[in-house]
């Protein structure tokens, strides 16, 4: 999951106010930071984040544990807030056109390999996250795990109308066309 990291300690939406945060070049991601009271900044490549933080161009960025650690950003922005605002799914795709040209036994082999690959990738990613988190914690960075109330506050910022979005919520601006998908995901989450 991706979380925010900054040069200032924070544990609430109010603590995001005024922070310049490097974001992916994606309007929804920028707006997400803006509704939290920060300013989403684009145009800074992943390899430039460390120096942009050191120079004061930005106050932080957002990413996962391995990237935060591997890029050395944890040395420049020592406060990591575990808000886990996005999760990027890892997807395996196969062309229906190609699969239709294979015999059934080969298609089954490919499907089985995909299942095994999924389990292997999850294991390796979990190991990398654990290793990166350990390095960051041992370096003395401050890791903030949100309270249930603070987590709910971050979620509410996404669903409540925002001046930053002309009175719309982030969900209204970006989720309307995908409401059936959002509802299906929420239903799965409720089952756990």
Predicted regions located by residue number:
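N-terminal secretory/targeting leader peptides
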Residues: 1-192
């Amino acid at each position: 999951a991706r979380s925010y990291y900054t040069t200032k300690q924070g544990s609430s939406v109010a603590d995001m106010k005024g922070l310049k945060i490097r974001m992916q070049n994606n309007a929804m991601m920028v707006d997400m930071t803006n509704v939290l009271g920060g300013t989403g900044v684009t145009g800074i490549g992943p390899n430039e984040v460390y120096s942009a933080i050191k120079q004061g161009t930005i106050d932080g960025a957002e990413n996962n544990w391995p990237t935060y650690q591997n890029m050395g950003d944890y040395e420049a922005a020592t406060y990591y807030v575990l808000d886990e605002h996005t999760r990027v799914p890892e997807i395996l795709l196969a062309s229906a056109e190609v699969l239709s040209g294979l015999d059934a036994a080969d298609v089954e082999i490919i499907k089985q390999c995909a299942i095994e690959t999924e389990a292997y990738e999850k294991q390796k990613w979990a190991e990398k996250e654990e290793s990166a988190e350990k390095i960051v914690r041992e370096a003395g960075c401050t890791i903030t795990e949100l309270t249930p109330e603070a987590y709910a506050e971050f979620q509410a910022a996404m669903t409540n109308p925002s001046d930053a979005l002309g009175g719309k919520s982030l969900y209204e601006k970006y989720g309307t066309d995908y409401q059936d998908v959002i509802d299906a995901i929420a239903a799965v989450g409720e089952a756990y």
